[in-house]
């Protein structure tokens, strides 16, 4: 994904949230909702923050350093927070459901690509080293290359010292907001997807 139509992403994400709102008891997004760019992207990129919801107003901010492949899913994830979802795992779930339902290939790909690190992490914890390495070989070389380039891109922007402080503080913040697993909550989206697939057969 070399470029992304941000206006089309906004249209598709809102449309799909309207589609799933009733099924998951979500608030439908208002037409006026739109993301704002971060004021200090260099600082946010330095700590690995892709987006966040502002604490004082119902608005969400996206990092202008986002790669095109990351933009649709991050847009949908942050919109989930605006719609009242506090859990990071649930925001990931709704971000995935919304983007993966899109008729736009780039938006669909963004959904699956965004969950790849969480799938890798879960697989690494569940499989033996041999099984994990065998499973990794099923991932296409193109996806592996894109993933490695994404990791290198953000590592180049990351500030280890500030990043470690932010990670610790954010972990405390999540736990203080009734998310006991803290930052690990993000990867719990895999369990949510498996549970949804088992109950509905949709995934």
Predicted region positions:
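Short helix/loop segments within enzyme catalytic domains
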Residues: 96-128
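Membrane-proximal, solvent-exposed terminal domains/tails of membrane-associated proteins
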Residues: 89-93, 105-112, 141-145
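Auxiliary, metal-adjacent structural segments of Zn-dependent hydrolase domains
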Residues: 1-60, 64, 68
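Amphipathic alpha-helical blocks and their helix-capping loop/short-beta junctions
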Residues: 122-150
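Soluble non-cytosolic domains of exported or imported proteins
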Residues: 4-7, 11, 65-70, 82-89, ...
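Active-site recognition of the HExxH zinc-binding catalytic motif
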Residues: 73-92, 96-97
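Polar alpha-helical coiled-coil and adjacent low-complexity
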Residues: 107-116, 135, 188-193, 201-202
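Pan-zinc metallopeptidase signature
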Residues: 142-203
């Amino acid at each position: 994904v070399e470029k992304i139509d941000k206006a089309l992403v906004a249209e598709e994400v809102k449309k799909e949230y309207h589609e799933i709102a009733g099924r998951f008891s979500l608030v439908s997004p208002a037409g006026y909702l739109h993301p704002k760019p971060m004021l200090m992207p260099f600082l946010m990129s330095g700590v690995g923050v892709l987006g966040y919801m502002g604490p004082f107003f119902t608005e969400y901010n996206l990092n202008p350093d986002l790669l095109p492949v990351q933009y649709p899913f991050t847009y949908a994830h942050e919109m989930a927070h605006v719609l009242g979802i506090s859990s990071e795992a649930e925001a990931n779930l709704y971000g995935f459901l919304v983007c993966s339902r899109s008729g736009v290939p780039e938006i669909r790909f963004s959904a699956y690509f965004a969950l790849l690190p969480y799938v890798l992490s879960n697989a690494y914890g569940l499989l033996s080293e041999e099984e994990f390495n065998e499973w990794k070989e099923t991932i296409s070389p193109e996806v592996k290359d894109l993933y490695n380039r994404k990791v290198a891109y953000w590592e180049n922007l990351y500030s280890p010292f500030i990043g470690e402080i932010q990670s610790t503080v954010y972990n405390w913040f999540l736990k203080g907001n009734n998310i006991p697993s803290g930052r690990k909550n993000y990867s719990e989206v895999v369990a949510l997807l498996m549970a949804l697939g088992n109950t509905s057969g949709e995934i």
